[in-house]
């Protein structure tokens, strides 16, 4: 959740997907170090195998995959950090869609509940 929220707070015009991925890797690595899964940031690739973002458009994975191209207002990208921990037999991936605005971004999927307690409450009351 922290990586997902950090990307939403960080994404803005002028940034690149590579820069967003570097931010994500740092946040995920800090969490994995706290959990004792890794000893240093360079080991995060053991649990984080993909990039945090790609362009969205007509296709789910839109045509611009150049990670060094700068983001521009009006672009829509994914925010999807994921950790895959084989020894715990789990994978965790939180995904949002972000609209790049003039001064940051808007989370297009903001209304989706993601807090564990809110999800449990929703499931019990359906």
At which residue positions do the language-model features occur?
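Active-site neighborhoods and metal-handling regions in enzymes and metal-associated proteins
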Residues: 1-126
């Amino acid at each position: 959740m922290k990586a997902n929220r950090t990307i939403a707070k960080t994404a803005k015009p002028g940034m690149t997907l590579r820069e967003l991925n570097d931010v994500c890797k740092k946040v995920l690595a800090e969490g994995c170090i706290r959990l004792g899964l890794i000893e240093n940031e360079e080991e995060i690739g053991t649990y984080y195998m993909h990039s945090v973002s790609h362009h969205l458009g007509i296709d789910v994975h839109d045509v611009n995959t150049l990670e060094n191209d700068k983001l521009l207002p009006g672009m829509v990208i994914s925010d999807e950090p994921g950790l895959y921990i084989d020894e715990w037999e789990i994978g965790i991936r939180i995904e949002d869609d972000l609209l790049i605005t003039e001064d940051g971004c808007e989370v297009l999927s903001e209304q989706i509940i993601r807090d564990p307690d809110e999800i449990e409450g929703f499931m019990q009351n359906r």
